[in-house]
Amino acid sequence: MMQSATVPAEGAVKGLPEMLGVPMQQIPQCAGCNQHILDKFILKVLDRHWHSSCLKCADCQMQLADRCFSRAGSVYCKEDFFKRFGTKCTACQQGIPPTQVVRKAQDFVYHLHCFACIICNRQLATGDEFYLMEDGRLVCKEDYETAKQNDDSEAGAKRPRTTITAKQLETLKNAYKNSPKPARHVREQLSSETGLDMRVVQVWFQNRRAKEKRLKKDAGRHRWGQFYKSVKRSRGSSKQEKESSAEDCGVSDSELSFREDQILSELGHTNRIYGNVGDVTGGQLMNGSFSMDGTGQSYQDLRDGSPYGIPQSPSSISSLPSHAPLLNGLDYTVDSNLGIIAHAGQGVSQTLRAMAGGPTSDISTGSSVGYPDFPTSPGSWLDEMDHPPF
């Protein structure tokens, strides 16, 4: 079955007789002019058809025949594409073609003619010494040293202070809350928003960080100072309480010592060997020790076999006058047969003798020559003695 086709005008198909009988829907349209392409040659870029006269660079309008570059639906020549989307010069912010010779300083890239001092505009060559600023600007060594000398000479003069408005300060504070140490692109954005120089923004953040650090340090020092003051105050109050308690009692150290000596003198002789002799009303010899107060509790500090102990004798201690001080009135001598003899002094009318005698006892150690041991059984000599009544 044959299909009829509409034949286009003769002027439109002049030179293209092979297209007779082809539907118009199958003829491609140009991406540049949106018309059907009836030319002998058709250009195709990224699945899009072009007239040979419509394929041009979007920037320089030069017709593209051999090679082209596309970005976001537009086509460019090589030069314009790298100028627009390639690496940009740090000084002029223009793109750098890949075939062009460039200069590099750290991470910054420059055109040859842009690699120059910002003060004298002298183009820097290979081997020249220069200073690189933080924002990428270049200063030759001679101009930098000259500017530094001028700054040193004018250091005595007061420099004008930078005034920051309330709106600018609010913007900087909000940025500081987000990041106390912002990156370079953030500082550039803040500089453009506030209208301040980039160096001023950087110095403001540095001063802000230093202030926060100083405040934290001062707060910690203040807390420790309060702690030390409280400890010192508590120690002082405890010392005052002790002094006040001593004052309330009304007794000094000298008075207390005097009273102790007086009490000891009133009690009599308090030697460990003799026990409490001043108030003896009745005594009993128990296992080589004196009864301290007549209640039956013996003084157990004497050791068996000690040459300085009281020998175990059947004699008892006679009653002495009560409340007679013995510390200053007794004179002790040693007799080879009688043991220890106390001569009478002030307030003493009798002689204290510790008698010794009897055969060797089985409980004795025989450590002393002048003190004979007692017999084995205490009953052999205890029954013969008349004890004073208690």
UniProtKB/Swiss-Prot annotation:
InterPro entries: HD, Homeobox_CS, Homeodomain-like_sf, Lhx3/4-like_LIM2, LHX4_LIM1, LIM_Homeobox_TF, Znf_LIM
CDD domains given in the database record: homeodomain, LIM1_Lhx4, LIM2_Lhx3_Lhx4
Keyword Ribosomal protein: no
GO molecular function, one term: sequence-specific double-stranded DNA binding
Domain LIM zinc-binding: 28-87, 88-150
DNA-binding region as annotated in the record: 157-216
Region called Interaction with DNA, residue ranges: 161-181
Effect ascribed to mutating L190R: In CPHD4; the mutant protein is inactive in DNA binding and pituitary gene activation assays
Chain segments carrying region Disordered: 230-253, 356-390
PANTHER family to which the protein is assigned, alphabetical: LIM/HOMEOBOX PROTEIN LHX, LIM_HOMEOBOX PROTEIN LHX4
Disease involvement: Pituitary hormone deficiency, combined, 4: Combined pituitary hormone deficiency is defined as the impaired production of growth hormone and one or more of the other five anterior pituitary hormones. CPHD4 is characterized by complete or partial deficiencies of growth hormone, thyroid-stimulating hormone, luteinizing hormone, follicle stimulating hormone and adrenocorticotropic hormone. Clinical features include short stature, cerebellar defects, and small sella turcica. A chromosomal aberration involving LHX4 may be a cause of acute lymphoblastic leukemia. Translocation t(1;14)(q25;q32) with IGHG1.
Stated name of the protein: LIM/homeobox protein Lhx4
Organism from which the protein derives: Homo sapiens
